[in-house]
A protein has these predicted regions:
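Class I SAM-dependent methyltransferase SAM/SAH-binding core
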Residues: 51-53, 57-100
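A short acidic, Gly/Pro-enriched loop at the edge of an enzyme's catalytic core
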Residues: 99-111
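A short glycine-rich, Lys/Arg-flanked "PGG" loop and its adjoining helix->strand segment in the class I
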Residues: 126-138
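Conserved beta-strand signature within the Rossmann-like core of class I S-adenosyl-L-methionine
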Residues: 140-146
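Short, glycine-/aromatic-enriched active-site segment of Class I SAM-dependent methyltransferases
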Residues: 148-166
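Short alpha-helix
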Residues: 167-182
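Core SAM-dependent methyltransferase catalytic element
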Residues: 195-221
Length: 221
């Protein structure tokens, strides 16, 4: 099966910038209280294993681990996974795709897509959300973070490197509608203005949704 171009693009770009990105992003959580607040809320609400999907260098996985979450990470980029394993040796990281997660149905209490769906074309989002739904147990939680907007931007420079990477900004109402169609119920929605114009140009959104069904009950298909 031929890999979609957007996956190849994202892997190649993040393999290229993995070390530079990790250095620049390492302390961002300390500078964005809303990030910490939402991650703290998610950590308090979730029970059972959590996978950080599109984990990058593992900074969010590491933070959740410190909050007591049973977390592991998966990323498309082998270089990012290598950085994550080095920086967070107490967390398990694997190479994988959010379109085809190596997990049984209903395996997770929670899933995290922290600025990772932003590299997936809008028309592919229903397939991604269906895969998130598949791997979550009934009542399981999904946390998403993304830039708010209705446009796609192509980056040819990033973190001091020549790259090619598309970033899709998302409309929270549209995302919630797609998540509802995939079998999720809304839980928490938060939007904020850019924290620092150096790295944020648009408002940012966080969504927590819950997979329909009672915890411990068989999934409804």
């Amino acid at each position: 099966v031929t890999e979609p171009d957007f996956l190849t693009m994202a892997r190649t770009a993040y393999d290229t910038v993995a070390h530079s990105y990790a250095d620049l992003a390492r302390d961002l959580l300390a500078e964005i209280p809303a990030d910490r607040a939402v991650l703290g809320l998610f950590a308090e609400l979730v029970s059972g294993p959590v996978v950080d999907i599109g984990c990058g260098p593992g900074r969010i996985s590491g933070y959740l681990k410190r909050l007591g979450v049973d977390v592991s990470g998966v990323d498309l980029s082998p270089e990012m996974v290598a950085v994550a394993r080095r920086e967070h040796p107490d967390v398990r990281f694997e190479v994988g795709s959010m379109l085809d997660l190596d997990l049984p149905d209903g395996a997770l209490g929670g899933a995290l897509a922290w600025y990772s769906v932003i590299h997936v074309p809008w028309e592919e989002h229903p397939a991604v959300f269906a895969e998130f739904h598949r791997v979550l147990a009934p009542g399981g939680l999904l946390l998403m973070a993304f830039q708010v907007g209705d446009e796609v931007r192509r980056y040819e420079q990033g973190y001091g490197h020549d790259i090619l990477l598309d970033v899709y900004r998302l409309n929270p109402d549209r995302v919630l509608g797609q998540l509802a169609e995939a079998g999720f119920e809304p839980h928490t929605r938060l939007e904020r203005q850019p924290a620092d114009p150096k790295w944020e140009k648009t408002p940012q959104a966080y969504l927590i949704v819950r997979k329909s069904g009672e915890p411990g009950q068989p999934s409804q298909t």
